[in-house]
Amino acid sequence: MDGREAMAFPGSHSQFYLQRGVFTNLTPSQVASGLHAPPPPPGMRPMSNPNIHHPQASNPGPPFSMAEHRHSDFGHSIHMGMASPAAVQPTLQLPPPPSEQPMVKKKRGRPRKYVPDGQVSLGLSPMPCVSKKSKDSSSMSDPNAPKRARGRPPGTGRKQRLANLGEWMNTSAGLAFAPHVISVGSGEDIVSKVLSFSQKRPRALCIMSGTGTVSSVTLREPASTTPSLTFEGRFEILSLGGSYLVNEEGGSKSRTGGLSVSLSGPEGHVIGGGIGMLIAASLVQVVACSFVYGASAKSNNNNNKTIKQEIKPKQEPTNSEMETTPGSAPEAAASTGQHTPQNFPAQGMSGWPVSGSGSGRSLDSSRNPLTDIDLTRG
């Protein structure tokens, strides 16, 4: 308020002048006349127009009421009421205290797959394990229940599968398979060339195929090894096959087996059978493979074991000789009569006459300085 303001009250109540919290009591007659009003207290100005009437003077109301509108920033309101000019009672309404939530510390790192209450936090459905628990409980309750065997089931190995075909198939499994290409020149015998190649090593040889032309072929009967028919001309090799296996009873170069061939003549006739001799008309290439089967592999292992056993006894004396001390070497040489590099025999000295034992001793004593040295002296 600037200066003072006049507030009129209905009825016979007096009018008050407000100036910064200071109230002045005036009668209605004084307010109406405006002339007989007592002088204002020092520091207060009189009203410029005393005939101003407050519009609320005609309306009956409470003796005194002041209200402030609720501010948007405050959640409470202030009400002031006065039944009389001397009674003023302010009322305050405080808002309820806000509820505090517990502080939760943020966890760092990768989220856990399983939360502490047992639920899956990543949305993964757990595997049902009821059947496994039931099986375990049944096996624990029943001690006579058969236990599950560990390892490979019996009868599923390679040897067991080969045993169904017979003992020969079980022992003839090849090892160290190696392919070969045999070249046969013009005019050479293909059979003799392949047989000599198989005799170089104690390995079985299997003929896979052959390509080229031949000028002469000698066929033999199946039941005998002697040739029976001979064909001459130019023939194309259609197929060539056979094998040479090592004969253990006949030696390392003894072989069992043979070759068979199918040839096509110039007119389209096909001849073939077991061959005794096959002469090449041009370069012929034979594809073969060699391998070591069970019998020869066992013999090779036995030979290696015997060789190792022979080598070990020879190495033991050398180790014992290296352990002898150098101080005992001269005494051992003198006791056994071994000749050192400085002790030469009398027979080896040609040109020196040997008449008796005395001259021989003098020669030995002059040549061997070890006899004059006393090893016990310092």
UniProtKB/Swiss-Prot annotation:
Q: Which cysteines are joined by disulfide bonds?
A: none
Signal peptide, first to last residue? none
Q: Where is this motif: Bipartite nuclear localization signal?
A: 105-113
Arranged from A to Z, the UniProt key words for this protein are: DNA-binding, Nucleus, Repeat, Transcription, Transcription regulation
One GO MF annotation is:
minor groove of adenine-thymine-rich DNA binding
Where does the protein principally reside?
nucleus
Q: Which Gene3D superfamilies match?
A: Hypothetical protein, similar to alpha- acetolactate decarboxylase, domain 2
Q: What GO CC terms are in its UniProt record? A: nucleus
> Anything noted about its domains?
The PPC domain mediates interactions between AHL proteins.
Its recorded name reads AT-hook motif nuclear-localized protein 5
